[in-house]
Curated annotation (Swiss-Prot), chain A:
This is Epithelial sodium channel subunit gamma. The gene is SCNN1G. It catalyses: Na(+)(in) = Na(+)(out). The lineage of its organism: Eukaryota, Metazoa, Chordata, Craniata, Vertebrata. It comes from Bos taurus. It is a multi-pass membrane protein. The record marks R140, E141, K183, V184 as: Cleavage. Phosphorylated on serine and threonine residues. Aldosterone and insulin increase the basal level of phosphorylation. Residues 137-224 are annotated as: Gating release of inhibition by proteolysis (GRIP). Component of the heterotrimeric epithelial sodium channel (ENaC) composed of an alpha/SCNN1A, a beta/SCNN1B and a gamma/SCNN1G subunit. An additional delta/SCNN1D subunit can replace the alpha/SCNN1A subunit to form an alternative channel with specific properties. Interacts with WWP1 (via WW domains). Interacts with WWP2 (via WW domains); inhibits the channel. Interacts with the full-length immature form of PCSK9 (pro-PCSK9); inhibits ENaC by promoting its proteasomal degradation.
From Swiss-Prot, chain B:
The gene is SCNN1B. It catalyses: Na(+)(in) = Na(+)(out). Residues 1-50, 555-641 are cytoplasmic. This is Epithelial sodium channel subunit beta. One of its GO terms (biological process) is sodium ion transmembrane transport.
């Protein structure tokens, strides 16, 4: 015999295969109900009376339904979060602080590039509003723009003509440049009137953008000429600047030494070397403090303004571009070191001749990602290529998405955002109709037609600095004189003139206290908690457990199936046998009961004899002695081991 | 004796377990327990038996594991937070108001005269003759100067920086490329630094500045601190701005108030500060309505023309909102209000209430912090700011021997000044930038459990308007100075509105995330889920274990007894007679037991057996059962005694 078979035989011998004890389904059910651990079933079988039984069936079924319902609720609410807010008092990392002058480039440096545009803007202003001489209060040195190129063809106004529309008659427009009335066959798009219903009571101003063939045109109108002219100027400005190289632009803008007059951090002097250059297309040279140079992040271990960053900025209003920016000051963005500063979107503006003190509170938030919410840790699960050199944020994603669509649809990239690989910034020379395309696309973006808003997810963790900004007059009357003269001495290398207080702005950025709040999402449920909740439900309604579940599987699936199978097998066998041998001799009936007249077997409890199933006493009876009353010998289990002895001695 | 009896009885009771062998016990347990698994082990076929055995073991271990997890979670002492936002009647915050300039220049001029002259001379030296207006022919008090002078450091040659005292034309370093006397240096060639010396000038450090502005400002502040530290407190208070000069008008809700409703407090940086609604002596005022009309309205006069010119360059009012009975750390948490402007501040009270030990490391009242709170002189509550400043002062006293002017003094200590502590400035500047000191303090101080912040929404407008300017100034001047002329100016006047916003509180309250009820219900849930068990099942199990122990004891004693008896008495050898044998022996005389085996049985009880009498009823065999137990019982009694 092979060893494998040997083992098999051994197993067979030791663990004989036995089917379910109950012969049919009904008995199986009865057995189950009587023996199961769940509480309802037993009552169904035990209780008497049809009504009671029905009631118990109803109760049991209700309990089962309730269990299912409650467990379904538990499982469906598994992915919920609980929020915890913690406060730590600790040394805090100082955020990166990006400071920009609102004016991107020194006007004296970029003027040669913008001369044509400036002239045409002034001309347009003259035709519509009837004034020509704009004299800047500050800028008196150059008024030479006047009539140098009178005869040249206006190229900017031809590309996108500025017009004024008369009330109620949008078909007719007055051209800004020529002053002629002309017919306009174009769709009129009222900028902003999509969201706000403005009743145009007066003349509206707008400009016309046409695609390559001039048949398809759109006119953008604004409620005020200020907006129209600024928007129009900005479009052309971007066009021009897109053709200038980065190095040239950096040189045209402000240097760090020029912008920062003094710098003080945590009680220690700092200077321009502590700032890194960051060139923004619309804001020129910005400087970032604490931008992880030398791989160390400065931290604060004391709250209060003297332990934060104190800078005095030099803002030269004389170099401001009159059409591009209309406010004076600087912009400050407080952000994470690896975050991209969105100067144009967020940021605090600071005023000149003022001390702006910005107190910060740090709040950190952590969200749980999939499957708890739709947020993302990094770029891995967003199908957008990052054109910024920074970690993920929703804003970066949206801008990247728009830029990608721009390149896709218009063939060139928008100027105020970084350049994707293999694309160029839009300009007239290469992409004559980009402005029309851009406006169309931008409108679609705002209306969420591009799908960017659905592709981009929010970031899972972010730091937020809550700012409390307050202003004070600086320098004070009595200190103005000495302060300005010594500041002039400090800046004498960069600036050759005497400083005025409106050229300066003081900025204080500090942690108000070192309390850091963290808002954290934690999973509200764990697996063990879910199981114990389900267990609680099962126990509450039916006193059930996993064992009961296994029992149910065993009884209702395995046993009943095997009973049915056996039943069918027997049926089939019987049918087969009847077919094979229709007349089969009856098997002799097995003898039932014991033929012992003297022995009466009790029905209720097994006696010693019946328990032993003793064979009937032999015929040769010992005379005289009656058989002992074995009933008295009903033994308890403690003696069961001795029974064999009794059995062996009995036949003598 | 009685006690012993009861003890014995109790012991006997306990012994009457559900069986006399391990197997019986286990079978009985499995049959009768309420946990679901074990029952199935005994009432099934061998295959299922094995399966159920494995399953039961598996479930038991699962339950134990999960219980371990739950208990561990419970012992983590996690908290859950609840957030509530709304409006309710609340105590109006305490409002501290200071002037940005600590003193009136007209009153401190005599103290600062020497220093100011020196400062002007310094400026003259730095700026050069054509830029400076002063002629430095006046006799200067150079004793202040020689203590901590400002120097030029010419770093054109980075290996040999030239150090040049501002008032000396000779050079300390190498004599190469000397600038012309009278115009020592220009900004791009030289940096201004401060020389700090200690131990009578033996060790010196230079504190470098990137700009001359910072250098002269820091130098002046250091010197002024030195001067003010020697002036007694009452005089300092007298030199500051009095309340009636500062506070021109006050309105709280509809109620008029005046400067007497403000509690004065002296702040080293800002001089006289005044606290509204501090709640120290009387009850705090509540505000029951949102909006400007129900808040605090103030008109202040900063008197900008009387500022100390070199000490403060920023003009405006300094204000801060804080809790009642807490010290205002106005330099850290205060905001500015601008002159000539109306500043409106909407307030939201952001409260965080934490549970203390063991949930978080916070302190209720600061009593368990190892640092003496120096601000307790003001009767204020504990705050971590107070702790950190006290800690700094403690370090300062330990290192430098004197207390810093900006922080309160411990008992019997003095503020630092140049006369008594000549090298304090050197010591202080080293301590100030020492990170180790700050970290020790951060480590030693604990946060307080209740943290209240006032979130402010600040907006500004020009005030007074040009049209109303004239009459407002007339009225205010008349009220304050009883003069018909205008004594105020737009440059000094500040209007403040402080009020509750529409939602005035946001309370974040911590509560225990996992309490004992949570733990029990989860333990019950787990036990019920896997095995259908309850606490009673655990008790059952404990009972079984006791029985088990008893059986073991019984067996051991029996073993010991039998060994002893075997040695002592030969007749106790062998197994006790079986019932059947005894039955035979007593009832059936015609029947003789097998002669080969019964030898010892027959001899076992010869003295106990009466001579057989025919017709005797069978003996009560039940009593026979006790035979082996009797032996043991007597033994265990012996053990118990």
């Amino acid at each position: 015999m092979a060893p494998g078979e040997k083992i098999k035989a051994k197993i067979k011998k030791n663990l004989p295969v036995t089917g379910p004890q109950a012969p049919n389904i009904k008995e199986l059910m009865q057995w189950y109900c009587l023996n199961t651990n769940t509480h309802g079933c037993r009552r169904i079988v035990v209780s008497r009376g049809r009504l009671r039984r029905l009631l118990w069936i109803l109760f049991t079924l209700t309990a089962v339904a309730l269990i299912f319902w409650q467990c379904a609720l538990l499982i469906s609410s598994f992915y919920t979060v609980s929020v915890s807010i913690k406060v730590h008092f600790q040394k805090l990392d100082f955020p990166a602080v990006t400071i920009c002058n609102i004016n991107p480039y020194k006007y004296s440096a970029v003027r040669h590039l913008l001369a044509d545009l400036e002239q045409e803007t002034r001309a347009a202003l003259k035709t519509l509003y009837g004034f020509s001489e704009i004299t800047s209060r500050k800028r008196r040195e150059a008024q030479s723009w006047s009539s140098v190129r009178k005869g040249t063809d206006p190229k900017f106004l031809n590309l996108a003509p500025l017009m004024a529309f008369e009330k109620g008659d949008t078909g007719k427009a007055r051209d800004f440049f020529t002053g002629r009335k002309r017919k306009v066959n174009a769709r009129i798009i009222h900028k902003a009137s999509d969201v706000m219903h403005i009743h145009n009571s007066k003349e509206v101003v707008g400009f016309q953008l046409c695609s390559n063939d001039t048949s398809d045109c759109a006119v953008y109108t604004f409620s005020s000429g200020v907006n129209a002219i600024q928007e129009w100027y900005k479009l052309h400005y971007m066009n021009i600047m897109a053709q200038v190289s980065q190095e040239k632009k950096i040189n045209m803008s402000y240097s760090a030494d020029e912008l920062l007059v003094t710098c003080f951090f945590d009680g220690v002097s700092c200077d321009a070397r502590n700032f890194t250059l960051f060139h923004h297309p619309m804001y020129g040279n910005c400087y970032t403090f604490n931008n992880r140079q030398n791989e160390t992040i400065l931290s604060t271990s004391m709250g209060g303004s003297e332990f934060g960053l104190q800078v005095i900025l030099y803002i030269n209003e004389e170099e401001y571009n009159p059409f591009l920016v209309s406010s004076t000051g600087a912009k400050v963005i407080i952000h994470r070191q690896d975050e991209y500063p969105f100067v144009e979107d967020v940021g605090t503006e600071i005023e000149t001749a003022m001390a702006t003190s910005i107190g910060m509170h740090l709040t950190e938030s952590f969200k749980l990602s999939d499957p708890y919410s739709q947020c993302t840790e990094d770029w891995s699960d967003v199908q957008i290529t990052n054109i910024y050199n920074a970690t993920y944020s929703l804003q970066i994603c949206l801008h990247s998405c728009f830029q990608a669509k721009m390149v896709e649809n218009c063939g060139c990239a928008q100027y105020s955002q970084p350049l994707p690989r293999g694309a160029d910034y839009c300009n007239y020379q290469q992409h004559p109709n980009w402005m029309y395309c851009y406006y169309q696309l931008h409108q679609a973006f705002v209306r969420e037609e591009l799908g960017c808003q659905s592709v981009c997810k929010e970031a899972c963790s972010f730091k937020e600095w809550t700012l409390t900004t307050s202003l004070a007059q600086w320098p004070s009357e009595v200190s103005e004189k000495w302060l300005l003269s010594i500041l002039t001495w400090d800046q004498s290398q960069q600036i050759k003139k005497k400083l005025n207080k409106t050229d300066l702005a003081k900025l204080l950025i500090f942690y108000k206290d070192l309390n850091q709040r963290s808002i954290m999402e934690n999973p509200a449920n764990s697996i063990e908690q879910l199981l114990s909740n389900i267990g609680g439900q099962l126990g509450l309604w039916m006193s059930c457990s996993v064992v009961c579940v296994i029992e149910i599987i065993e009884v209702f699936f395995i046993d009943s199936l095997s009973i049915i199978a056996r039943h069918q097998w027997h049926k089939a066998k019987g049918w087969w046998a009847r077919r094979r041998a229709p007349a089969c001799p009856e098997a002799p009936r097995a003898p039932q009961g014991r033929d012992n007249p003297s022995l009466d077997i009790d029905d209720d409890l097994p006696t010693f004899t019946s328990a032993l199933s003793l064979p009937p006493a032999p015929g040769s009876q010992v005379p005289g002695t009656p058989p002992p009353r074995y009933n008295t010998l009903r033994l308890e289990r403690a003696f069961s081991s001795q029974l064999t002895d009794t059995q062996t001695t009995f036949p003598h | 004796m009685h006690v012993k009896k009861y003890l014995l009885k109790g012991l006997h009771r306990l012994q009457k377990g559900p069986g006399y062998t391990y197997k019986e016990l286990l079978v009985w347990y499995c049959d009768n327990t309420n946990t679901h698994g074990p029952k199935r082990i005994i009432c099934e076929g061998p295959k299922k038996k094995a399966m159920w055995f494995v399953l039961t073991l598996l479930f038991t271990s699962l339950v134990c594991w999960q219980w371990g997890l739950f208990i561990k979670t419970y012992l983590n002492w996690e908290v859950s937070v609840s957030l509530s936002i709304g409006f309710k009647t609340m105590d109006f915050p305490a409002v501290t108001i200071c002037n940005a300039s600590p003193f009136q220049y007209s009153k401190v001029q005599h103290l600062l005269k020497d220093l100011d002259e020196l400062m002007e001379a310094v400026l003259g030296r730095i700026l050069g003759p054509e830029l400076s207006q002063v002629n430095d022919t006046r006799a200067l008090n150079l004793s202040i100067w020689h203590h901590t002078p400002l120097v030029f450091i010419n770093e054109q040659n980075p290996h040999h920086p030239v150090v040049l005292d501002l008032f000396e034309d000779n050079f300390n370093g190498s004599a190469s490329n000397s600038p012309a006397p009278g115009r020592p240096c220009s900004a791009h060639r030289c940096k201004v630094a401060m020389r700090l010396c200690s131990h009578n000038g033996t060790t010196c450090t230079f504190r470098n500045f990137s700009s001359a502005t910072q250098a002269v400002t820091e130098w002046y502040t250091l010197q002024a601190t030195n001067i003010f530290a020697q002036v007694p407190n009452q005089e300092l208070v007298a030199m500051g701005y009095p309340a009636e000069r500062l506070i021109l008008a006050c309105l709280f809700g509809a109620e008029p108030c005046n400067y007497r409703n403000f509690t004065p407090i002296f702040h080293p940086d800002y001089g006289n500060c005044y606290i509204f609604n501090w709640g120290m002596t009387e009850k705090a005022l509540p505000s029951a309505n949102p909006g400007t009309e129900f808040g605090l309205k103030l008109i202040l006069d900063m008197g900008q023309e009387d500022y100390v010119p070199f000490l403060t360059s920023t003009a405006g009012a300094r204000l801060m909102l804080h809790e009642q009975r807490s010290y205002p750390f106005i330099k850290e948490e205060g905001i500015y209000a601008m002159a000539g402007m109306e500043t409106s501040i909407g307030v939201l009270v952001d409260k965080l209430q934490r549970k203390g030990e063991p949930y978080s490391q916070c302190t209720k009242n600061g009593s368990d912090v190892p640092i003496q709170n120096l601000y307790s002189n003001y009767n204020t509550t504990y705050s971590i700011q107070a702790c950190i400043r006290s800690c700094f002062q403690e370090h300062m006293i330990r290192e430098c021997g004197c207390g810093h002017y900006l922080y309160p003094l411990p008992h019997k200590r003095k503020y630092c000044n140049n006369q008594e502590f000549p090298d304090w400035a050197h010591c202080y500047s080293a301590l100030r930038i020492s990170l180790a000191q700050r970290e020790t303090c951060i480590y030693a101080c604990k946060e307080s459990c209740n943290d209240t912040q006032y979130k402010m929404t600040i907006s500004m407008a020009v005030w007074p308007s040009e049209a109303s300017e004239d009459w407002i100034f007339h009225v205010l001047s008349q009220e304050r100075d009883q003069s018909s002329n205008i004594t105020l100016s737009r440059k000094g006047i500040v209007k403040l509105n402080i009020y509750f916003q529409e939602f005035n509180y946001r309370t974040i309250e911590e509560s225990a995330a996992n309490n004992i009820v949570w733990l029990l219900s989860n333990l019950g849930g787990q036990f019920g889920f896997w095995m259908g068990g309850s606490v009673l099942c655990l008790i059952e199990f404990g009972e079984i274990i006791i029985d088990f122990v008893w059986i073991t004891i019984i067996k051991l004693v029996a073993l010991a007894k039998s060994v002893r008896q075997k040695r002592a008495q030969a007749r106790y050898e062998g197994p006790p007679p079986t019932v059947a044998e005894l039955v035979e022996a007593h009832t059936n005389f015609g029947f003789q037991p097998d002669l080969a085996t019964p030898g010892p049985d027959v001899e076992a009880y010869p003295h106990e057996q009466n001579p057989p009498i025919p017709g005797t009823p069978p003996p009560n065999y039940d009593s026979l059962r006790l035979q082996p137990l009797d032996v043991i019982e007597s033994d265990s009694e012996g053990d118990a005694i």
